[in-house]
C-alpha cells in the first residue's frame, strides 16, 4: 500500500509503502494499515484524506482484502475527524498525468518526476 502526504502547494511532506507481507493474517494487515494511517494523520496534521475508488478485480478474495484495508484507512481518518474523499481511477490518472487512460507506468513516472521520488 502506497501513501503520500502532500501540502496544498503540491509539496511532498512524506511518502512510502507499507509492505503487508504474505505471512500476516488479514487482521494483522488491517491493523497495520489502521495504525499507519492514524500515525501519519497525527504526525503531519492531515486535514483531508484522498483515496482511489474501487476498481473491478478479477479475484474476489483480493477485492475483499483490498476492501478491508481501505476500510481500516477510512476508519482511522474518521476517528480523527478527517474527511475522506474518493476519486475514480480515471480522475486520478487525469489529475496526475493529464490523461484519464494513462498506464500505471505513466502515472508512476509522473509521480516520481513531480515529487522527486526514487525509481
Question: What are these model-predicted stretches?
Answer:
Residues 1-119:
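Phosphate- and other anionic-substrate recognition elements at nucleic-acid/protein interfaces
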Amino acid at each position: 500500500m502506497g501513501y503520500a502526504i502532500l501540502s496544498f502547494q503540491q509539496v511532498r511532506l512524506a511518502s512510502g509503502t507499507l509492505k503487508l507481507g504474505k505471512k500476516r493474517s488479514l487482521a494483522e494487515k488491517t491493523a497495520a494499515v489502521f495504525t499507519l494511517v492514524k500515525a501519519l494523520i497525527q504526525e503531519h496534521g492531515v486535514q483531508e484524506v484522498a483515496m482511489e475508488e474501487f476498481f473491478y478485480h478479477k479475484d474476489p478474495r483480493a477485492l475483499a482484502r483490498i476492501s478491508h484495508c481501505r476500510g481500516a484507512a477510512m476508519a482511522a481518518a474518521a476517528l480523527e475527524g478527517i474527511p475522506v474523499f474518493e476519486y475514480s481511477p480515471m480522475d486520478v490518472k487525469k489529475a496526475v498525468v493529464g490523461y484519464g487512460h494513462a498506464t500505471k507506468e505513466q502515472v508512476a513516472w509522473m509521480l516520481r518526476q513531480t515529487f522527486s521520488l526514487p525509481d
